[in-house]
Amino acid sequence: MKKILWRPLCFFIAALSACNTAQKNTEPKQLTTDGYTNGAASADGIGKFYMGREISFVMGAAGSEWLERDTRNEEENTALAVQNLPLQQNSVVADIGAGTGYYSFRIAQRIPRGKLYAVEIQEEMISQLYHRKKELKDAVVTIVQGTEQAPNLPDNSTDLALMVDVYHELAYPREMLQAIYKALKPGGKIVLLEYRGEDPSVPIKPLHKTTVAQLNRELEANGFKLSYKADFLPIQHFLLYEKK
């Protein structure tokens, strides 16, 4: 097995963060509604907290090359992640925060009679998705422009919603989860891939990692229950939630 070199990964995450690397845990101070609080922002956060977790900055279009880096499968075993998604050939999947479509177009190969909604809010990423769809002559992926609070999907339309290193960046996690809940069919599922916050050896900034305990609190508060947890990926949790 090749030894994975994390230095490029660490450098990129650091470059996207604020220059102040002395990050402190900042307690939220001003209470708002629906589980949100406001407080002083840390180096990588927006100063908005959900159920005690500070929300991180969003990776912008500047991160496109990193999302498509040649070493990504070696570092994260993305092929194994796609292989383990609970899919049928006719499944309807929503890739929330699809970015460049790295996962979207790989998943599309597993659902030739299904549909994949590639949901994005950033115009630059949406342009890249359309370019890639045309380049690949793809007939499965449908590109959807979402908002910060909703994926803009039809109610009861989707079997599986996927978020890959996206959930911790959602500015409105409560609203997004509730919108996804409506979009999922009865028995629908969410899969979250998130960098493991419990593991200090994972070379990612703290706000870009999450713990299972924290994710469970947030998902359960919005109508989901954890049905499968696995750590077969090198640095990410693989968590499957079902509608209650």
Regions found by a protein language model. Name each.
Residues 174-189:
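A short glycine-rich, Lys/Arg-flanked "PGG" loop and its adjoining helix->strand segment in the class I
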Residues 122-123:
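Conserved SAM/SAH-binding beta-strand->alpha-helix loop
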Residues 151-160:
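A short acidic, Gly/Pro-enriched loop at the edge of an enzyme's catalytic core
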Residues 25-86, 92:
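Class I SAM-dependent transferase core
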Residues 136-148:
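Conserved SAM-binding strand-loop segment of SAM-dependent methyltransferases
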Residues 89-99:
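Conserved class I S-adenosyl-L-methionine
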Residues 222, 227-244:
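Core SAM-dependent methyltransferase catalytic element
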Residues 100-112:
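Conserved SAM-binding loop of SAM-dependent methyltransferases across substrates and taxa
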